């Protein structure tokens, strides 16, 4: 219910911004599709590297992903709506349009670094506060956060990063199997990535 409230709040607060940025998507839909596709390919490759690191460390049990998998197994439709539609909208408006967009005016590398770090911490902090060894899972969210910033910047519209975020989460949700097994999906829940 918190994501439903946050989605409604963002739509009411930033509806004009979303509408204005939608024009850029309508002007160049092919560019958006290509950028999202290239970004997803880069996400997939970076995910292979991150999973390799986590396998080497024997740390494949990301508690955020585990929580989303458990919720999805109990209520797939609602969790799908939350992770594929609500979370990308809310999180992209916060981390890309808000933090990244504001800081980019002053210092582009700092904008990338701060947005990436805050997005990554957002997804794992609750679990890491209870068990500090869970901070390692931040590495699963850093690459996708970089790519979401890149997609936002290259598309010159928040809809580019929203589209990429939706794709990452949709594929991650698809990977959740009824038996509770999941493919490597660091972006599941809360997004993503």
Where are these regions (language model features)?
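Hydrophobic cores of alpha-helical transmembrane segments in multi-pass inner/ER membrane proteins
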Residues: 3-13, 83-87
């Amino acid at each position: 219910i918190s994501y439903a409230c946050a989605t409604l709040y963002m739509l009411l607060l930033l509806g004009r911004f979303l509408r204005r940025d939608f024009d850029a998507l309508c002007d160049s839909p092919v560019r958006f599709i290509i950028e999202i596709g290239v970004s997803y390919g880069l996400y997939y490759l970076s995910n292979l590297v991150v999973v390799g690191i986590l396998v080497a460390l024997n740390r494949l049990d990301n508690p955020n992903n585990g929580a989303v998998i458990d919720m999805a197994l109990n209520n797939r439709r609602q969790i799908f709506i939350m992770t594929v539609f609500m979370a990308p909208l809310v999180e992209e408006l916060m981390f890309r349009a808000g933090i990244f967009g504001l800081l980019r005016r002053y210092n582009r590398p700092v904008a990338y670094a701060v947005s990436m770090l805050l997005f990554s911490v957002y997804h794992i902090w609750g679990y890491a506060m209870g068990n500090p060894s869970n901070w390692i899972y931040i590495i699963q969210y850093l690459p996708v956060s970089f790519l979401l910033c890149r997609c936002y910047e290259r598309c010159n519209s928040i809809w580019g990063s929203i589209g990429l975020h939706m794709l990452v989460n949709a594929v991650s949700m698809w990977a959740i199997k009824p038996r509770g097994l999941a493919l490597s999906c660091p972006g599941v829940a809360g997004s993503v990535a």
